[in-house]
Structures are given as C-alpha cells and as structure tokens.
Amino acid sequence: MKDKEEKVNGRTTINIIMETDSKMIDEVVVIGYGTQRRGSVTGAVSAVKGQDMIKTKNENPQNMLTGRIPGLRVWQKSSEPGTFNNSFDVRGMGAPLIIIDGIPRSTEEFQRLNAMDIDDISVLKDASAAIYGVRAANGVVLVTTKKGGAGKTEFSYNGSYTFQQPSRMPELCDPYESMTLFNEMSMNNINGGSWVFSEESFEAFRNGTRRTTDWNDLIISNVAPQTQHDISISGGTEKTKFYISMGYFYQEGIFRSGDLNYNKFNLRSNISTEIAKGIKFELGVSGISDERNTPYTSSQDIIRNYWRQGVLYPAYADPEGTMLNYNGLDMEQNTVAMMTADISGYKKYKQKYFQSSATLTADFGEYTPVLKGLTAKAMFSYDYRADNNEAFRKEYYQYAYDEQTGTYKQKVYNESSPSNMRREFYDKSQMLGQFTVNYDRTFNDVHHVGGVIGWEVQKRNGDNFYAVRDLAFSMPYLLAGVTEGQIGAMQTGNNDLYEQANEALIGRINYSFADRYLLEAQFRYDGSSKFAKGHQWGFFPSVSAGWRISEEPFFKSIDVLKFVNQLKLRASYGVLGDDGDLNYDWAMGYTYPSTSGNMANGDYNGYSPGYIFGGKFISAASPMALPNENITWFKSKTFDIGFDFEGWDGLLGVSFDYFNRLRTGRFA
C-alpha cells in the first residue's frame, strides 16, 4: 500500500483509507544466495506465497504447487497414504534441486514439510540457476520457511477432520453375466470348447443356494478419515524474534481392514537474536517423524487381485465368515486375507528426520557509513535421517467346503509359508558449511550495485544393512527364526550406500541504472568427488539483462498507459551442470559374490560362480563396468528471452518466455 500521512489534531479515532501502491506489488523474491525485488529480476523466476499454497488442502506441498508456477509440472502417481509417489520437473527437464532455507535437501524432505511453515517458494527456471552448479541443470526450487517478527506474541491453530471416498467404483457383473461370458469364451476357443457353467449353476444363484460376492463391499471402505492439526507461536522484540510450530497429520487408506495408514509429526523452531551491534545469530531446528503402515501385499496387488475374482465365489468357506475360502478364487488368492495384517502380515516404514542450521551475520554498515550495504554470513548445517523398516510375512490357512463329506479342507496358502521377517536400517547424514560476503547499495539514487562472493563445502554419507530370516514361530521378531537361509546384507544403490563431497566458489554481481537498465552475471566453480582427479572441477557461468520499459520517462508520459505498472524485457544465457546420475564410475570395482546365469538367484546352471580351494567352495568376484576417468558431469546450455507485464495495480499479470536448452555429455 502507499504511505499516507494524516495529522492527528487531538483525535482519538482516525479512519484511514489505504491506496494500492504498484511499487509494493513489486515484491521481494528469493534467488540464489540472496533476494531481489521482482521488478529487478533479470532471470525467469516465479514465486508463490505460502498463504496462497495452503488454499489447496493436501498432505504434500509438492501437490500444492500444481498449476501455480508456469513451467513447473507436478504429477501424482499414487494416492496411497504416505507413499509420496510424485514427480515434478521444471520445463520438462527432470527433477529440480531443492533448497530449503539455503540448504540443499531431498525431494522426500520437501514432500514431508509442513505446508503451514512455508513462507514462500521461488523457482529458478533458466540460467539464473547456474549459481548452484553441478546440480542445477534441471532448475532450482527455493523454499523459505516462516520466521518471527517484532511485536506481540501470536498464537495460531489450524485443524481439520475430513473424509475421503472413491469418486466411483467399478460396477461388477452379476453372476449370470459372468457365467455367460465364461461360457462364450470357452465355446469360442479355436480348438472348440464346452460349457464351463451348466444350467444347474445358473439355477443355484436363482434359488439362493449360492450367493453373489460383492468384493467392493468386502474390500473398500465407504469413507477414509484424514485429520490434520497445526499450532504455531511467533513474535519477539526488535532484537529477538522467534517462530515455533508443531503439526500432526493422519491419513487412512480405503481398505476396510484399516491396515493401510500414515501418520506424521512435524516440529520447527526458527529463532534469531542480535547478540551485539550489527551481529545477528540465527538458529533453525526442525524434526519430522512419520510412519507408513501397509498390509504385507502391496496395495496395487490387492486391488488387482480383487478385480480378478469376479462375483461367483465367496470370500469365506463357512456361513459364519470365519474360514477364508480358496476354492474357485483366481490363483487361490483371497483378497480379504491379503489386505488384513493380522492374517497375512504387514510392512512398516518408519522415518525420522533431524535438520539444523546455525547462522552468524555481520552488518558492517552498522559500524561505519562507508561500509553501508556490506554484510558477511557464516552458516553451518547438519541433517540426519534414520529409516527403520519391517516386513513380516505371516503364514495362514485357507479352506474349501467339501460337499461330499460335509467337511472343510484346510491348507496353508503357499505364498505365505514359511513365515518370514525382514528388518532394514538406513542412516543418512549431511554437513554443509557456507561463508558469503554480500554487498547491496545504491549511489546517487540511480546506480544500484549488488553482489555476493562465497565458499561452500558439503559432505553426504549413507549407510544401511538388512537381515532376513524364515521363522519357526509366527511372530514378528528375528529371534524366532531358523538358521537355514538367513540373510544379512546391504543395499548398494546410489542413494543407499555412499560417501560424497562437493566444494564450490560462488559469485554474482548486479547493476542497475535508474531502475531501468539491469545487468547480472554469476558463476559457480564447482567440485565433485564423483569424478577422478583432474576432472572434478567445472565452471558454470551465466549472464542476464533486463529493460524496464515501464520506468522510462517517455512511457510514463503516455496517459493511456497509466494502467501499466510493469513492462520488462529480459534475456539470459548460462551453462549448468548435473552429476546426479553418476556414482564414481571412474573407479575400479567388483561384484561379490559374482552373479551370472540366473541373476535372481546368482547362479549358473544351478551352481553359484566360484572355485573349489582346499575342498571348500569360494564364491567368485566379477569386475564391474570398465572404469573411465574421463567421465564428468553433463552440461546444459540454456537461453531464455521473455517479458513481464503487470497492470491495474496488480490485478493482471502476464509473463511470457521462450527458452532453448541444449544438453551435452549425457550417457546414452
């Protein structure tokens, strides 16, 4: 809004009508290692406020971005509670780098972020992402969480309890349609056929001897509850400010057993204080604890299975509904058993996230006017993630009614035997250190100069192990297992077992004249441990320029264009890199024990590869792919040209971009 002065003249009540100020509409947006006024941005940067995001209710902030930022695509692959099976990309070029409060973090951490804690999100879509180097080829998503402000303490609570239900379920055939279709299929067999169901089978359903099975009603619940509660407290003084929040979320799946569900706890604290003149200390701490519970069989297989069953055969062999039926069911699989953890077993996925950062900022302008606009910032961050997973397969029996003897035949469902327990443990950590010097100052009201120079070091580690054991007793503990066939091993995927490090020198300089002519250049000299010596460092520069036509005197003098608050032309070009798909491919490695022939069992013609030494069989080791020390990151050369329009005091905004992105060096 526009500033407005009003004389008090002894009045105790003053009514003031505020007017929109287009300059205030030109808000501050977050960019790489800093902020800029939207009107001064020369890159393709889009932003959305947290308060606008939460208008769309969803457990995943990633979904809340759908349709809100041009060029950002979000698609949801599954609605199963807690899976977060989503993907997003910037301009169709792969998953972007996620930066939360200045710290690179994973997509999983962003998905579990409490949306009520988000202040704003900016997306760098063009060469402006070059300052993030070898991980910015697909763009950058910058997330800023809420901070406290000076003033009275404010309490906030937001809660909801909602119900979800399928929009429409598939309509099942009645038994007569089903039997007719089976008969037609059999009779039209190329080799000739016969009736599968006789007239007596049709009559059994007509007279009530046999009844239709409504698998929809047996498996799918009418409604699935979901609840969310968030509470926050914020406030502070001119020197000390704080924001503290807690959140709880619970979502149940659509299975009637209730064994498909997800719950999450969030905690966040952002505190800043001025410890001395011009010296500010900031501490940010957050924690996430979540748990996803599922039946042992995947939701996809459960739904696929009950669709195959039809309506002709019952879920239970006895009228009382205590004995699970297998007779007549496809592959003898009973969907009721598959969806019920007490019968067939369960899987639990527990994750705990701890994130922290400590920042010390010095404003040298507080000591002398000569250094006005010069600040230095040092930050250290430590993140830790722990996963504790269980998979318990439980042996169970199924039954079939024998009409001749009037008894029930019992047998173990083959795929449930023997009972089995698997435990998995993963831990991942990240340390990050940043030191930056920033300068931002305007001379003679027309020359604005800004810049940043800094150094960044990051180390990441991942470790894991798992154990699998067949059980002598059907109880979810490894101690109940037998010694034969037990397994203890590690996952060796790129995201499971790793040690990685990055270092970088970063820089940016901005210049604007009369807030009309804008220039920016930035770079990142980035190093990655994923490559061999001599190939670890790369230089990633970018340049951009802008012209704010709406600030030109000739433009402002045209009365019919008074409604235009902003009209800006901009262009950028830069080189970005990506090392995400690479994993020390320059180093020699071996696979042990060696596998060949049947890769699933690690054997060849029934025998594991190896040799006999001293009467003992020794498994063989086989070399991995031939190492290549010349492997390095692939590059993305990006050109973007566009314009931004804003009119009628922000009531209408239009952005247009043409971009071209050329990738080189990517493996075929």
What does each of the following model-derived ranges do?
Residues 1-252, 256-268, 280-282:
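Short, small/polar-rich motifs associated with maturation and membrane association
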Residues 53, 270-279, 284-289, 295-308, ...:
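Extracellular/periplasmic, surface-exposed regions of secreted and cell-surface proteins
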Residues 100, 277, 319:
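Short, ordered coil/turn segments that flank beta-strands lining enzyme active or ligand-binding pockets
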Residues 190-213, 228, 301-337:
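Acidic, glycine-rich flexible loop segments
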